[in-house]
Amino acid sequence: MREPSAELIIDIDRIRNNIIYLKSLLKPDTKFMAILKANAYGHGLNIISKSIDDLVDGYGLVRLEEATSVRKYTSKKILLMQGVYSEDDFKIAYDNKFDLVVHNKNQLFAFENSDINIWLKVNTGMN
């Protein structure tokens, strides 16, 4: 019996066309952020982000390693959705000008004397 095989074909033109279409539905001054967590959902973080960089205003990433990888070739806004949990990670985020998601009051207080941009995660019961 043959092993089943799988093939993943990434059509960059379709991804780009989808972004262009979605943006056409928005007001012209609306910002558009690409969420590319988990290696762009398994499609290849660097391949996808380099291919759409001219179409997006920024990126939402989970892991610090992914964010630093994308920062190597873009100066656009990068939101580190996981946040940071150590002083070393905070320094990397600060030096790379990442925005951070704040998940709890301890993180909020830790960043209160910093000029780093933060986004507040507010859980309304839907996670």
Tell where the protein language model's regions lie, with residue ranges.
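Active-site-proximal beta-alpha core segment in soluble small-molecule metabolic enzymes
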Residues: R2, A6-I10, R14-N17, T30-N127
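Structured alpha-helical segments in the cores of large, soluble enzyme domains
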Residues: N18-L25
